[in-house]
């Protein structure tokens, strides 16, 4: 499921009180800015592993409580449920019998204590929330409840595999050991590394979350998130009308020798990791009289790779060398993007042969709950031929330096 997206509903009826506030929404920017002091930011990171940001669910919950009549009224009556999408689905699927979430989703709310794996009273107080508003935190392959899909199934089936989409993709890629890394290219991008059973010390713009807790065994992850990947290509198609089909971007970009000095910084809702600047907005820089549609398209493709390189640099600084990254998501089929990303990172990218890695990961969690014991089989994933770095180091440095100058212009 989507992780940071915030949902609110009445406990008594199960009816939603407001539209879901998606993970991309920055409406709580002013709220987090008001909370931001060096001391507060340090405490938030120490407790939750996350940067104080409207990206995470806590600020969205607080915004809903302060600005929407429905949630405020339900809270006054003790009838308010806040949750991420998994908690909402579990509640609905079980007919209101289970108000639960798993540790991977809970760790992305900015309310979970990463050491105790329970809701933090300190963070609840910071955001003006109450524990009773939040679901019970469970292991990722707990028995969350049963559902017959309102009679569509002949009998109730157990719900016993729940994971945030990015963590599920890490599991689906078979990254069970410390240092295993994956790159999920969807609406946005997640670059994630298995950090092992001990909470890692991460620095810079990287955050720490819970990967999963399966059969009592805990996995932490280090991660960097990029806001616009597939969404950037959709913008080229639907808003600028530079392409008719999203699949066209790779061949068009590959048809140029280079970007012609054009850089696109897709900060439509701010810059995510490693910058965490919600106040920055998008820009296209370096346009000249010879710049055309193709240069903007290539600049968009390259921007995805440059942002991944930004995150990769921070991850290797915190977690050590990462010689291989598994890639999943729709953009894994874009050969230009895969090769250019491998060139910028200086490491091999191996696209997954499976299309829906997040679903596979959640399914694996459920299988472990139901008694499957072939854990080595989880790591035996099939991947397509990899993309290895092929660009000359001097050219790579020139390209990446141009990107860093473009970003610096906006900061």
Residue positions per predicted region:
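Gly/charged, well-structured mid-domain segments that form the phosphate/adenylate-handling core
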Residues: 140-143
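Conserved hydrophobic "DFG−1" position in protein kinase catalytic cores
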Residues: 8-9, 193
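Carbohydrate-associated surface elements
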Residues: 25
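Active-site core segments that coordinate phosphate-bearing ligands/cofactors
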Residues: 29, 35-99, 110-121, 125-128, ...
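N-terminal cofactor/phosphate-binding cores enriched in small/glycine residues
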Residues: 1-8
């Amino acid at each position: 499921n989507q992780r940071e997206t915030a949902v609110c509903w009445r406990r008594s009826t199960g009816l939603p009180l407001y539209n879901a506030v998606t993970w991309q929404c920055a409406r709580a920017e002013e709220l987090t800015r008001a909370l931001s002091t060096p001391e507060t930011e340090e405490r938030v990171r120490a407790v939750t592993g996350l940067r104080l940001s409207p990206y995470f669910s806590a600020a969205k919950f607080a915004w809903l409580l302060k600005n929407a009549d429905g949630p405020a009224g339900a809270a006054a009556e003790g009838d308010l449920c806040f949750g991420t999408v998994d908690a909402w689905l579990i509640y609905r699927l079980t007919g209101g019998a289970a108000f639960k979430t798993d540790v991977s989703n809970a760790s992305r709310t900015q309310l979970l204590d990463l050491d105790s794996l329970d809701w933090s009273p300190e963070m609840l107080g910071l955001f003006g929330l109450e524990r009773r508003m939040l679901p019970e935190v469970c292991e990722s392959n707990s028995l969350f409840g049963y559902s017959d899909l309102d009679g569509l199934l002949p009998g109730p089936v157990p719900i016993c595999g729940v994971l945030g989409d990015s963590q599920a993709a890490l599991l689906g890629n078979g990254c069970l050991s410390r240092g295993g890394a994956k790159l999920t290219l969807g609406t946005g991008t997640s670059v994630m590394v298995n950090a092992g059973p001990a909470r890692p010390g991460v620095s810079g713009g990287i955050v720490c979350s819970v990967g999963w807790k399966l059969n009592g065994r805990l996995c932490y992850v280090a991660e960097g998130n990029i806001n616009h990947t597939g969404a950037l290509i959709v913008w080229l198609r639907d808003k600028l009308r530079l392409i008719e089909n999203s699949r066209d971007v790779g061949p068009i970009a590959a048809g140029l020798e280079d970007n012609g000095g054009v850089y696109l910084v897709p900060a439509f809702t701010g810059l995510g990791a490693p910058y965490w600047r919600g106040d920055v907005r998008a820009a296209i820089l370096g346009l000249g009289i010879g710049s055309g549609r193709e240069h903007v398209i290539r600049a968009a493709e390259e921007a995805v790779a440059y942002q991944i390189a930004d995150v990769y640099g921070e991850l290797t600084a915190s977690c050590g060398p990462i010689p291989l990254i598994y890639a999943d998501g729709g953009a894994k089929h874009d050969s230009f993007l895969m090769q250019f990303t491998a060139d910028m990172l200086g490491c091999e990218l191996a696209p997954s042969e499976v299309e829906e890695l997040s679903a596979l990961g959640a399914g694996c969690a459920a299988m472990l709950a139901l008694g499957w014991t072939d854990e080595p089989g989880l790591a035996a994933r099939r991947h397509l031929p990899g993309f290895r770095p092929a660009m000359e180091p001097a050219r790579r440095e020139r390209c990446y330096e141009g990107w860093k100058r473009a970003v610096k212009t906006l900061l």
